[in-house]
């Protein structure tokens, strides 16, 4: 509840700042005079922007199962599945959350992810390759990392941030289009953009603003990885968490087998070396994560 209240308060503050700034700059009266109601536009963009993000959140478990072909363990069929259920249950109790669904997905790359609209209605999944190649204490650390994501409410927070950014990408893209249209109509002979011209400007502006928004989301995603690593270290031990990340680092040359829609929720996405790749990366470099744990900079 506190997260929702903080989100609403932050969103209201951003709306007020944007409204005041546009009014002080004379943009709002100018646009209103040219037929664009700022408040109505903002409400429209908020509803559409948040709806898309929240729908994605609510169907995230279903989408994750479908896209990875994950098999939920309802009744353990072997000792490994029994151990997996017991370990997740123990970690969930220690983290103060309800038992999530546990699944295994068929990928040779060592990976895992957590998703779900609620920390008490989540899904934690690990790859078959991870179970084959990692030691039990390392698997436990990876599971603790994912439980940390769930306990921290990262999926919900990320969806809310994405919804706010969706709102402002749509909002400012249409303001830009309206300004261009009004500029072309500045005299009696100007015909403006027309419908297709207006939509073309909106699309281009949404792409530009969307790239900036993606960097913001990626920054938050990287930050939450450090927090999840810290939670994993707290639940499973720093040594085990560091060893698990080191094992993942050894596999960074293996092709990434995670669907694009789940890369932000996986424990690793491979290596990113170039500056632009780092700006849009959902995960920090594994070396940085290992260093942070060793220095206890992010340990909770």
Curated annotation (Swiss-Prot):
Please give the cofactor(s) recorded in the UniProt entry for this protein.
Zn(2+)
Name the top EC class.
hydrolase
- UniProt GO MF annotations: metalloendopeptidase activity; zinc ion binding
Primary subcellular site in the record, as a coarse category: membrane
Record GO biological process: proteolysis
Show the stretches that span the lipid bilayer. Answer: 4-24, 40-60, 153-173, 193-213
The EC designation for this entry is 3.4.24.-
GO cellular-component term (any): plasma membrane
User: Cofactor: bound how, per the entry note?
Assistant: Binds 1 zinc ion per subunit.
Residues of the active site: 146
Q: Where does Zn(2+) bind?
A: 145, 149, 225
The record's listing under InterPro entries reads: HtpX_protease, Pept_M48_protease_HtpX, Peptidase_M48
Mode of membrane association: Multi-pass membrane protein
* Localization in the cell: Cell inner membrane
| Keywords in alphabetical order | Cell inner membrane, Cell membrane, Hydrolase, Membrane, Metal-binding, Metalloprotease, Protease, Transmembrane, Transmembrane helix, Zinc
Highest taxon above the source species:
Bacteria
Say yes or no: keyword Phosphoprotein present: no
Please give the family membership noted in the entry.
Belongs to the peptidase M48B family.
Q: Which NCBIfam families match?
A: PRK05457.1
Q: Which HAMAP family match?
A: Pept_M48_protease_HtpX (MF_00188)
User: In its UniProt entry, what is this protein called?
Assistant: Protease HtpX
Q: What is the lineage of its organism?
A: Bacteria, Pseudomonadati, Pseudomonadota, Gammaproteobacteria, Oceanospirillales
